[in-house]
UniProtKB/Swiss-Prot annotation:
Lignocellulose is the most abundant polymeric composite on Earth and is a recalcitrant but promising renewable substrate for industrial biotechnology applications. Together with cellobiose dehydrogenases (CDHs) an enzymatic system capable of oxidative cellulose cleavage is formed, which increases the efficiency of cellulases and put LPMOs at focus of biofuel research. Its EC number is 1.14.99.56. Pfam families: AA9, CBM_1. It comes from Aspergillus fumigatus (strain CBS 144.89 / FGSC A1163 / CEA10). It is an enzyme of class 1 (oxidoreductase). This is AA9 family lytic polysaccharide monooxygenase A.
Length: 349
């Protein structure tokens, strides 16, 4: 059972740590398209990996700077498997993808480029929430930051794909949920006949008080309502759903529902990408994971002194806590501060 101190520590931690994530690359039919998170790439990437927390902000559309096109556009066709690759820092085997405390759902939206850039016409084509006692983000971490969708049979043209993570480690308070998203520029070259529905506006698809946004993951729960519209069934037209939280109900698939092993590739072949199931299953009751704050402010108790040995933890990195097995010595000039029993962090002395 969580303590008042634990909640305060979790809230306090939000302002310092940056164990966050962005999309670094995309794979098409298991072929690595190379790093895309730069001005000469194909991902409209923000200047850093900080989250968006104001659901009314225009940055919710494609993140900070997301209205600015980038140099490249990936060519895809209906039926192609598109895999998004998230990372905390770099495309390396040692990268932790995102803090293990940042549990929550993973979703993908699609919109025609012009409408999507303006914040309109967004259609949810995939989602994964909480099922069988496991969060979508846990699956993402286990699969080395990869999750996949199948391109629907839409008309030829330019579109944006918008993968999104909602981290709920501070979702117990209004404004605490953290949103991570980017927009990937793609050009559909096949002549599909299934026009996207009208979609929803982003911002506008979520409210700060939606049950799937304002959600306490540290108390026992039996299900999780994934926020936003329902997943498009891939064939119907018209509205794709109203804003608010979608109940965990079965929908006709718009994307592949079976995980397929990837081909060996030069970058990170250690895991198989998750392929989303468009139907969410009712989650079973499970004891929630112990809170592990991922962010903080300069308060809390000092749990250890700073250090300068090789392999020391950098500023804002985790340096201790229950069940933590990594390095505990901070770089010179830093101290390891205890925010709660589960999360200690290197901060300025």
């Amino acid at each position: 059972m969580k303590s008042t101190f634990g909640l305060l520590a979790l809230a306090a931690a939000a302002k310092l740590v940056s164990a966050h994530a962005t999309v670094h690359a995309v794979w098409i039919n298991d072929v690595d398209q190379g790093a895309g998170n730069s001005a000469d790439g194909y991902i409209r990437s923000p200047p850093n990996n900080s989250p968006i927390t104001d659901v009314t902000s225009t940055d919710m559309t494609c993140n900070v700077n997301g209205k600015n096109p980038v140099a490249k556009t990936l060519s895809v066709k209906a039926g192609d498997k598109v895999t998004f690759e998230w990372h905390h820092d770099t495309r390396s085997d040692s990268d932790d993808i995102i803090a293990s405390s940042h549990m929550g759902p993973v979703m993908v939206y699609m919109a025609p480029t012009e409408k999507g850039t303006a914040g309109n016409g967004w259609v949810k084509i995939a989602e994964e929430g909480y099922s069988n006692g496991k969060w979508a983000v846990a699956n993402l971490i286990a699969n080395r930051g990869k999750h996949s969708i199948t391109v629907p049979d839409v008309p030829a043209g330019e579109y944006l794909l918008r993968p999104e993570i909602i981290a709920l480690h501070e979702g117990n308070r209004q404004g605490g949920a953290q949103f991570y998203m980017e927009c990937v520029q793609v050009k559909v070259t096949s002549a599909g006949t299934k026009t996207l529905p009208a979609g929803v506006s982003i911002p506008g698809a979520y409210k700060a008080t939606d049950p799937g946004v304002l959600f306490d993951m540290y108390n026992s729960f039996t299900s999780y309502p994934i926020p936003g519209p329902a997943v498009w069934d891939g064939s119907s037209s018209g509205s794709s759903g109203s804003s608010g939280s979608s109940p965990a109900t079965t929908t006709a698939p718009a994307v592949s529902v079976t995980a397929v092993p990837t081909k060996e590739a030069p970058v990170d072949t250690s895991a198989t990408p998750t392929t989303f199931v468009t139907a969410t299953k009712p989650a079973t009751t499970a004891a929630p994971a112990a809170p592990s704050a991922s962010s903080g402010s300069n308060s809390g108790s000092d749990s250890c002194n700073s250090g300068s040995a090789s392999g020391s933890v950098k500023i804002y990195g985790q340096c201790g806590g229950q069940n933590y097995s990594g390095p505990t010595s901070c770089e010179a000039g830093l101290i390891c501060k205890e925010w709660n029993p589960y999360y200690h962090q290197c901060v300025s002395a």
